[in-house]
Amino acid sequence: MSYERLLCLVLVASFIAASVAQHPGDAPRMEDDSSAIQRRGLPCGCRGKSGIYWFSGKCPGGYGYTTYCSYVIGLCCVK
């Protein structure tokens, strides 16, 4: 593997890691659970409403999502 490809791979991996990283204090915690389960999503817009972007193939249960919009890799789930 050439050094240029290796450098490109490292840069892409670093960008992805920085994009999905979230400071523990930024994520809201579940109030009824002391094990500190955190929501993992990014803000997005869907049909004129704000939602949460999820990288998974479907909106997770238990958050009260009623609709969603498809994006390139995931979904924007809206309450």
UniProtKB/Swiss-Prot annotation:
| UniProtKB keywords | Cleavage on pair of basic residues, Disulfide bond, Ion channel impairing toxin, Nematocyst, Neurotoxin, Potassium channel impairing toxin, Secreted, Signal, Toxin, Voltage-gated potassium channel impairing toxin
| Domain of life assignment | Eukaryota
| The keyword NAD appears for this protein | no
The name this protein carries in UniProt is U-actitoxin-Bgr3d
**What range does the record give for the signal peptide?**
1-21
Q: Which family does this protein fall into?
A: Belongs to the sea anemone type 3 (BDS) potassium channel toxin family.
For this chain, one GO molecular function annotation is: toxin activity
The GO cellular component terms are:
extracellular region; nematocyst
Q: Which residues form the propeptide?
A: 22-38
Per the annotation, which location comes first and is thus the protein's main one?
secreted
Q: Which Pfam families match?
A: Defensin_4
Protein's cellular compartments: Secreted; Nematocyst
Bridged cysteine pairs (disulfide): 44-76, 46-69, 59-77
What does it do? Potently and selectively inhibits voltage-gated potassium channels Kv11/KCNH/ERG. Acts as a gating-modifier toxin that shifts the voltage-dependence of ERG activation in the positive direction and suppresses its current amplitudes elicited by strong depolarizing pulses that maximally activate the channels.
